[in-house]
Amino acid sequence: MAKTLIEFIAGKTFKADLPPVTKAAAAGSYGGANSVGKYYQYFEGQSRNNAISVPTCSRSRDLMASVIGCMQLRMYNEMWNGNEMEKVYIAPRSWLRRISPSVTNNFLLSWLFDDLFFYGAAYLYVTSRSSDGYPASFDRLPFANVTRQDQPGPVFFGPSNQLYFAGEKLDSANVVQFLSPIQGIVYQSTQAIATALKLEAARYRNASSSIPAGILRQTGGEPMSAQELGDMAAAFNTARETNQTAALNEFVMYQETLMSPDKMLLVASSEYQAMEMARLCNIPPYLAGISVGSYSYQSSSEARADLWNFGVRAYADCIASTFSMNNVLPNGTYVEFDSDAYLEGSYTEEMSDMAMPTDVVSQS
């Protein structure tokens, strides 16, 4: 670029005319984009790990993840046919069949859903771009590793412009942000999850406790010492093991304990809390093997439809709609899950293996 007269006399060039300086990362730097793909730095949040330890929550998550992970993605345009907008399916971009070069779509989409389900948001980092500037490959960023400085949550109002990964700032233009229409379950009902965890802990303690089947009570005579009572109980147990009939004198009475296994394991409380967790996870309770009283006939196809409509669809639409945004695909190009194959029954592994009666059923 030709210098002006002032620049020639001063012997220097104005900074505005100089190309921007690109600062190289210091040797051994870490965090931010430098940590993407370094899986030894990845982790899941403790609140998520606590919630997944609840059996109903785990079952709900696995049911929905199995649907999200096993459905194919397809790409289409829309065209006006004179009456309505018609979908015209097109050849997909290469990344649609393998979103991340390092893992399968089944794995990545299932764990992308996992972040949406538990936290209400999920992230993919753009690791390469095609010649037209659009993303060509991605890598998942675990939600627990990402910090949103401008929107700490738990409710997110839009994409964040201040994302930090492993302590360093990320260029938000290289991050695809999935925002769930449903708040993450670890934020929705913390007390319900805490109650379920305490209930499981109580059941575990009771399962480890030895409660006698009965009590020998002295009703008369000279009071017996602790040693004598222990010897009498041991002799009584030995006699019961070797004889069908036990004998007691008029000064000793045998009284059965009223504690039963269902009371010890808090079965009624467990059933109620399982129902609460099914409500929290937004799936019909019968899909998690929970008894719901009166029933009407439910076929396997109707069960798949219930799982899709009440549980999976909101998350599937969130993922597909985010992939259809203009920072991922050109305007007018869209992505959707092939839900028809699932609803028509070509994907039946998960539902056919469910442990439920043949006349299983939804609440009437």
Where are these regions (language model features)?
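Structured, contiguous alpha/beta core segments that scaffold functional sites
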Residues: 2-266, 270-272, 276, 348-364
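Short Asp/Glu-rich motifs
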Residues: 115, 296-297
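Short acidic alpha-helical/loop segments enriched in Asp/Glu that coordinate divalent cations
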Residues: 245-247, 285-296, 325-329
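Short proline/glycine- and acidic-rich turn/helix-capping motifs at secondary-structure junctions
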Residues: 250-255, 295, 340-345
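Internal mixed-charge
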Residues: 264, 273-282, 316-319
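Long, compositionally biased
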Residues: 304-340
